[in-house]
Amino acid sequence: MRSVLSFALLAANVVSAAVLAPFDYSGYKVVRVPTQKGNVKEVQRIITDLNLDTWKYPKAEGQNADIVIPPSQIPSFMERISGMDREIMHEDLGMSISNETTFEAYSAGYAPDINWFKSYHSYQDHLSYLQDLQGLFRTRSEYVDAGKSHEGRTIPALHLWGKGGKNSKPAIIFHGTIHAREWITTMVTEYMAWSFLSEYNKNADITSIVDNFDIWIFPIVNPDGFAYTQTSNRLWRKNRQPNPGARCPGRDLNRNYPYQWVGPGSSSNPCSDIYRGAEAGDGTEIKVHIANMKKIAAYKGIAMFVDWHSYGQLFMSPYGYSCTARPPTDARHQELSRIFAQALKAVHGTPYKTGPICSTIYQVNGDSVDWALEVLKVKLSLTAELRDTGARGFVLPADQILPSGEETLAGTVAMLKAVIKG
């Protein structure tokens, strides 16, 4: 999801089982203002006049404005929106972040189980967990150091396979946490990895999927940004790559892929949260992921790519760069999206909206989905926005990790069964 947060922040050391100390958001509120006929420009004016940051910025009538308000601006803001509908997403954002960032301890060498999904975790604990998980299933999986981030962190991946051995079937590739603050995507992609491994030869549908595809799961595509959200700014989005001549670091990695790179769905301003970079594909992590995906494609091709995001409860298809163009495979993409959403909803009743990226959420240039479909020629290329629709937004309580994983797995299994069926 998109926003324009840019605060100066304090750093703190990451310690498992400790409450982390990022920038103090105590007293900040997050308020949703649904736009209606005639008030879009007024809501935009309030945001500009009070110099407020947004999690969602309203561009048209009917879109929600999810607005972050510092304590000093709350009286003015509430006066300005008097008479408008509003919903409090976070009464005290600092308290919500404090509750979310109390990590449960994880000891390397522990046999992973469902308890991992009771809490969010530090970057280093994610590496230990993935290696421990793979260690339980050595004959049909491998832990892969897929490459290094700009700051030298490991970009981890799990590679899973069934009958026929590794690299013998078309690949499924899942990406999580390309946007640093979207922590639920890290946990949900790991839940799917855990389920595909632990339920193989127990659950017939999962066994069939693992036997029919090579599965590659990259839970932390943007490790530098992810680590930064745990030490300095919980709401950071981009990577941490410096921008020469600019005071603001980072580029939005999902605006940096070398396809339809320039357009209104990205920014040339290094301080923007949707900064596309100085050149197409110049992000350190994007270079790593392009190289990995090309390598995987060279084996038996890529049957499906899914880039997991939050928040919004959406499951979307190409294109992001255009709201009018459609790929030749549009009907198949829409069919599979509906199958995913229906199966997901059957688990906990969570509704998902489906459709093309541009017309469903907003216009995007240089995104992974369009690049994978048009440049790498992946057969099916999709993206999701996981829970929720805005009640908690990016700061999703830990008690929603497990239900998010359960319903996303159900949707994914149903969708991949349909792919196998043809």
UniProtKB/Swiss-Prot annotation:
Residues 18-112 form a propeptide. One of its GO terms (biological process) is proteolysis. Gene3D superfamilies: Metallocarboxypeptidase-like, Zn peptidases. Residues 119-419 form the Peptidase M14 domain. It comes from the Eukaryota. It is found in: Secreted. InterPro entries: M14A-like_propep, M14A_act_pep, Peptidase_M14. Its main location: secreted. GO terms for molecular function: metallocarboxypeptidase activity; zinc ion binding. Keywords: Carboxypeptidase, Disulfide bond, Hydrolase, Metal-binding, Metalloprotease, Protease, Secreted, Signal, Virulence, Zinc, Zymogen. The active site is at E385. One of its GO terms (cellular component) is extracellular region. Disulfide bonds join C248-C271. Belongs to the peptidase M14 family. Extracellular metalloprotease that contributes to pathogenicity. PANTHER family: PROTEASE FAMILY M14 CARBOXYPEPTIDASE A,B, SLL0236 PROTEIN. This is Metallocarboxypeptidase A.
